């Protein structure tokens, strides 16, 4: 019996990294839904690879919080309740408001350039209708705001919670990605507030942005 050809062709280098990126992108785009089982043999067949890199990739997803392992049942795309999402947004709002405040204490042209590059990446992703690339650039933007303040403890807190924030953005509101171009514009507006040096307004807007879902920001 001739095996069916793989549906997706993968390069031969760093297969586990490629499989991880493919699966992560599938979760972001909603192709793998919250609660859906991740069957390693089926994923390996579709991608035309052995199960070993798939197993490694799925373990990384579990570590990141994008998947969960259930004993004797297997691995599943993570689900997040409305209550969990709301709690995470409250924590993120506090952290990001303080990050904006501290970033403005030592704002520099290099910080601006880094965030402007993130906004540019978001605009390019929006033009290509690439939700995965936009999510990655979005998260990088906020991480760079935290880094701009130079507070190692704040950065450590962000690093610990970053995968949860990614999970929130991807799974907390899976059916509303919003207008990708508008998402890029929101971040350009946030960057303009930092450039203007208006501490209270920047703190307020970063907090509001982080506390809201894409659907709420779209209203």
Annotate each PLM feature.
Residues 1-105, 153, 214-219:
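Short linear motifs at protein or domain termini
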Residues 17, 93, 109, 113-116, ...:
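Amphipathic alpha-helical repeat elements characteristic of tetratricopeptide repeat
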Residues 62-68, 159-164, 178-181:
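Mobile beta-alpha loop/short-helix "lid" or hinge segments that flank ligand
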Residues 84, 108-111, 130-134, 150, ...:
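Residue-level recognition of alpha-helical structural elements
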Residues 88, 115, 134, 138, ...:
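Hydrophobic packing residues in well-ordered alpha-helices of helical domains and bundles
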Residues 91-107, 139-177:
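Hydrophobic, amphipathic alpha-helical faces that serve as interaction scaffolds
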Residues 96-124:
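Amphipathic alpha-helical dimerization/coiled-coil segments
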């Amino acid at each position: 019996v001739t095996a069916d050809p793989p549906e997706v062709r993968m390069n031969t280098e760093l297969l586990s990294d490629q499989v991880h990126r493919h699966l992560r992108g599938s979760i972001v785009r909603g192709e793998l839904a919250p609660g859906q089982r991740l069957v390693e043999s089926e994923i390996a067949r579709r991608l035309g690879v052995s199960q070993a890199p798939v197993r490694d990739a799925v373990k990384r997803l579990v570590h990141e919080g994008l998947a969960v392992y259930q004993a004797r049942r297997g691995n599943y795309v993570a689900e997040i309740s409305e209550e969990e999402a709301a709690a995470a947004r409250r924590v993120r709002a506090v952290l990001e408001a303080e990050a904006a405040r501290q970033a403005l204490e030592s704002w520099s042209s290099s910080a601006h350039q880094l965030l402007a590059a993130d906004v540019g990446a978001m605009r390019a992703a929006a033009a290509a209708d690439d939700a995965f690339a936009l999510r990655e650039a979005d998260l990088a933007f906020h991480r760079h705001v935290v880094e701009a303040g130079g507070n190692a403890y704040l950065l450590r807190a962000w690093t610990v919670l970053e995968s949860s924030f990614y999970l929130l953005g991807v799974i907390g509101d899976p059916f509303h990605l919003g207008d990708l171009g508008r998402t890029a514009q929101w971040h350009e507006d946030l960057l303009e507030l930092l450039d203007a040096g208006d501490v209270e307004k920047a703190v307020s807007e970063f907090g509001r942005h982080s506390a809201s879902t894409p659907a709420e920001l779209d209203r």
